Amino acid sequence: WVWNDLVFKNRIGLSAGFDKTAEAFDELADLGFGFIEIGTVTPSPQKGNPRPRIFRLVECDSLISRTGFNNPGLDMIKLRIAQRRNSYVLGININKNPSSEGRP
């Protein structure tokens, strides 16, 4: 499947949040996903919100996630991406740190 010159193995992908630290994207691609999205990645490392940060709402059969984008930061993510061993579409979900200046 082709979209804007990007060649996807198929249309089924794995969205951001599963591999927040960019440590398993090659292995996940080997499972057959058409694309992998890592992150959320912020410019600087951050630990995320204090625990508990995931809450179950039994009455609604749902979860609330307030993880706070815990990740090792952009520099570490760039190193891990540089070691990528396979060719596939890799997306990166990005956000700013709470201390970042500029637009919200």
Where are these regions (language model features)?
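A gly/proline- and charged-residue-enriched helix-loop-helix capping module
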Residues: 39-89
